[in-house]
Structures are given as C-alpha cells and as structure tokens.
Amino acid sequence: RNFGIGADGLIVLARDAAANLQMLMWNADGSRGAMCGNGLRCLARFAEANGHTDSREFLVMTDSGPRAVALLDAGRGSGDVRTQMGDVHCGPKRLVEVLGDSYEFICGDAGNPHAVTFVEDLDAAPVERIGAAMQTHPEFPGGVNVEFVQAVGSNRIRQRTFERGSGETLACGTGAAVAALAARQVGNIDGHHAYVELRGGTLLVIGEGPSLAIEGPARSVFHGEVELST
C-alpha cells in the first residue's frame, strides 16, 4: 500500500450491457466502493495500455454514474489523466463531537461521502484516531471518508485522508475534489484551479463547482498474475 506492489483496494475493468467500459471497485476490507478518483485514472491508463480503447477521451461507467476521462499525453500505460468528477457538493459547517472533542466539519459528496476538517498542522493531525472513530459515529451510519486539510498558500492546500474501508491512504481523488470545494467555501481558494498536495503526490482540481475535474498522474508499477480458486 505504498508505491510498489500492493494496493488500497481492487478495481476490475468490465463492460456494461451497452459495452461501455465499467469500473467495479472494492475497498481493502472487501466492501464495495461507489467511486474512486485515483482508481479511475489508473483504470483509464490500464484500458489504454491493454488495448481496451483506442480513444484518448472516453466514458467509464461507475457506481456513481458515467465519468469522462482524457489521456493527456502520448505515453502508453503512464502519464497524466484528466477525470471529470461530476457534480461535487458541500454543506455548511457543522460541529461533531468525536472521542470527547468537538471538530468542525464540512460534509460533502463526490459520488461517495466525505467530511472535511481544517487544521493548522497537518503532520500532527490525529488522522488514524479520529478517522477510525468516525466510521462508527452515529451521524455517519454508513461510514465516511475523513479529510484533514491545511491551507498552505494561494489556491494550494495539503490533505490527508482516512478512507472508509481502507484507513489512511497516500492520496484520495474524490477527497481532493471535496476538500478543494470546501476550501473555496471558507475562502482559502479563489481561483479556477486548486492544487492539492497529498503524501502520494499533487493533484490539480479544475473548476469552481459543482462540476469539477481532476488532473494527475497514473503509472504502472507492477504486472502479475494471481490464480484464484473457484
């Protein structure tokens, strides 16, 4: 679950009844995931490299609806990908008591649920402790992806994410979209583009909402075969 062999979840490339490319996703704990922004970029590059599409721009069906993707360079199997995230929404600030302390969250949706809280020191944020507690919080009966965000400059934020079903991950594309929109809501972002720095790299969020797109890299790190018993 770093930069080599391993993963935060499983993505299967399939085709729906209309022969469209389809993304099926499972989290690390085996639960189904409705949408994964980073996974969508990886699936797009995988589809290109393995001959499932000849197009530079195409649709991928997800459990959250169709998503348009665009391969931005001439590389095969690696390079930047732009993904349309659909409509992303954020609600007003709300106070939530977690493990005896009150946290101010902006809750949003990017095809899956997110709760964003802003901190002054991201490195010291209690990501694992609070993120895990939020998964059984009565206000989030289905669990929630939790983003800890620090504003670091003009139209630039840093982010750490505790993903429901996977724990803390190095990056979260849908979380970056919601975090950028939440940062715009509180005045930390005012431009058309926002840069979101994650432990796994930097993503570019394009748009002012509700429709957003994300640009970021996707590259192959390992090929293998696994024999599954029936």
Language model region names:
Residues 87-89, 110-114, 218:
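Glycine-rich beta-alpha junction loops
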Residues 96-124:
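Internal active-site segments that recognize and position negatively charged phosphoryl groups
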Residues 1-77, 115-230:
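A glycine-rich beta-to-alpha transition motif near the start of alpha/beta enzyme domains, typified by
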Residues 58-60, 93-100, 106-108, 194-196:
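Short acidic-hydrophobic surface loop/beta-edge motif
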Residues 63, 86-91:
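Zinc-dependent deaminase
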Residues 77-85:
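Short, solvent-exposed secondary-structure boundary/capping segments
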Residues 89-93, 221-223:
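Short, charged/polar, Gly/Pro-enriched secondary-structure boundary elements
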